[in-house]
Amino acid sequence: MRHLVWLLLLLAAPPALAKSPPRVDSAVYTDPVHDLAHPARMAVIHIPSGGVEINGVVYVAAGTGPHPVVVLCHGLPGNEKNLDLAQALRRAGWTVITFNYRGSWGSPGPYSFANDLADVDAVLAYARDPAHSQTLGLDPGRIVLGGHSLGGWATALTAAHDKGLAGAFMISPGNIGRFAKLPRAGAIEALRNNGMESLATTPEAMADELIAKGEAYDFVTAAPRLTGTRLLVLTSDDGGAPTADALVAGIRAAGGKSVTTAHAPTDHSWSDARLRLASEVIGWLRATR
């Protein structure tokens, strides 16, 4: 989404100020003790959604389960999948589910923003299914949803209606609903430049969907429905911080008191702040256990 974020500068206020970074969590750089009976492992899964099965990989934590779970959503198109973060979260004792939306990175079906949201719901349903939670050692009562960029947008809109989540975190969230305010030609060009090779759609179809949905895709409008959600919002110097700040302000104005925020002076992908990213998320997650 790196080619899109500059457009947010046209629709937003100045960026937030950075705070001091947290101490690097030991799980970022320390392997867990090898558990012969219950070793860390990977599992390939196929998640039913919209009449197809989307691709997923589970990073199962070491030790006797059930383990708390993070469902990690990638961005648009998803070049940065934050798998280093997934590994760090696993070392911290969380089992992490990663997946590819319909029509992206080999998952079958057409790509659309509506399908993104439906796919997130499908992954959560998969994790809560007793057959899968038992096989993978998941604790269905302790599922946290998180995402980067577009994945942060999907996280906000999903958490707004899924009250069974233990929490949610957003990393440099891209509020794609704001792009409905751009001229259609400008939105098409931005989407095309962002990289379409891995997506089963066209920039024209994506732009038309955004324009048709309008405010329904603006995550700031979800603020009143997030007041009871434990939420971590991480922003960066990518132009998108003001819309994330607006979401936080809206939640707090509506009475929400469980929002944690942090801002890092790095790019949209946190390219030079990977250890800080993992430490921010792990530190916040430790308080949910």
For each of these PLM feature ranges, what is it?
Residues 20-64:
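N-terminal cap/lid segment of alpha/beta-hydrolase-fold proteins
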Residues 67, 74-78:
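Active-site glycine-rich loops that stabilize anionic/oxyanionic intermediates
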Residues 72-75, 98:
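Structural cue for short, hydrophobic secondary-structure segments
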Residues 89-108:
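Conserved alpha/beta-hydrolase
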Residues 111-137:
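Alpha/beta-hydrolase active-site loop
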Residues 209-279, 284-286:
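Serine-hydrolase catalytic core
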